[in-house]
Amino acid sequence: MNQRTGQAGAGRTEIPATAAVCGLCCDVCSLFLATHEDPERLTLLAARMGWEVEDARCDGCRAERRTPYCRSCVLLACAERRGHTFCRECSDYPCPQLEDFQRERPHRAELHQNLDRIAEVGADAWLAEVKDRYTCPSCGALNSCYDLKCRKCGHEPSSAFVAAHRAVIVESLRPPVA
């Protein structure tokens, strides 16, 4: 299987480009949302990352067009090397690389639950569930975990995910103390 494009081999179903091997849903990534819905926000995010706008455009971890960070993902490279569709399929799961990756940022808080759910219901059904978890209860807009308020209507919290993890998200957004 070509992990990057989601092309499946004989007898296997196609994996959506936005279902990352680690259990992240790219549809709710700030860069993915900006790529597909908000060019102005994409410009701001690219500047913050020190990238050209074109480099910040992303169609998902399994797509051809990915950010520099996603193009160099060690988890995707490992899964491709071992022939796995998701990290949970590996005999080394959960490995130190995945554990470290999860601890680094709040949007990764539910990786293990996500991977378990993918195994239970499949990638397509899981993606629908995750999108629901990141949807504004007021207007139905999809938000990233870093959108404390809905990016469309301003409702707070922007989603069930933000409601559950607000404290750690807020802490991660604070500038480092000098």
What does each model-identified segment do?
Residues 2-122, 132:
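Hydrophobic scaffolds flanking metal-cofactor catalytic centers in soluble metalloenzymes
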Residues 78, 95, 154-164:
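Short Cys/His-rich micro-motifs in 6-15 aa windows
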Residues 58, 87, 136-139, 150-153:
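Short cysteine-rich clusters marking metal-coordination/redox-active sites
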Residues 79, 136-143:
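Short Cys/His-rich zinc-binding micro-motifs
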Residues 12, 20, 155, 175-178:
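Amphipathic, glycine/alanine/valine-rich membrane-attaching segments
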Residues 100, 162-172:
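Short metal-binding segments enriched for Cys and/or His
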